[in-house]
Amino acid sequence: GPGPKLRLLPTKVTAEEIAQLPGALAPVQGRAPALILGVEESRLGAFRFDPNSEHHLYLFGDSKSGKTTFLRSLAREIVARNTPQEAQLIVVDRRRSSLGAIPKEYLAAYLTTNESVARDMAEFVAFLKERLPGDDVTPEQLANRSWWKGPEFWVLVDDYDLVVTSEGNPLAALQPLLAQAGDVGLHLVIARRMGGASQAVYERVLRSLIDLGSTGIMLSGNPDEGQVIGRVRPVRALPGRAIVVSREAGTFRAQLAWSDPV
């Protein structure tokens, strides 16, 4: 008889469609479901991100490879799974690509210039430092993070290559807090073009994300860029088709969730 049919990744799939897959909405360790990022190739199951156990993400890709779409899909997942009291977004968007994509009650700041990023980050870091646990915090409080109340903050950065310039990086003030993200309720998600990525991974903030074992995502790119994440080189691919490098799950291919522009 005919051989088994190869089940292939879709070329376009929405988070709503992925949510229908078995286990896509299963709670993680008794807590809320993880955020749906896409579909994994190996088992054609949901590729998920649990913000309780992982804090940050970074992604590289050529233009039109799906970076902005990924950030838009992620923002919509955050909004779908949280109240505005639970999650607030700070969006750094030099090209204004995501203007209007996030309901204003979830939007703490929408920053389009490096000057506004530098100014707001200084205030934001001062605010987050107030959340750092003091000497009087008990082990129980540490376990359930009950010594402060308020939303988790998601800093979503598009076109990171336009944000980091020869003058410096207006996000540098966040770097010392990245390792304590769980204590202060911080998530940093960076999207950058693939050109020059193999050098960009030595920039301080991005290097911190990598050193902390954050999940990295590579969309379409020129293989000549060389090894970008670990030993993995980019490949030319369809929009949204990704190579994911995860500390927990290893390296796998995925199709990232599509979401329509505003």
Labelled PLM ranges:
Residues 1-41, 46-48, 191, 198-262:
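Phosphate-binding and hydrolysis-coupling loops of NTP-dependent motor/remodeling domains
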Residues 27-140, 144-214, 221:
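P-loop NTPase catalytic phosphate-binding loop
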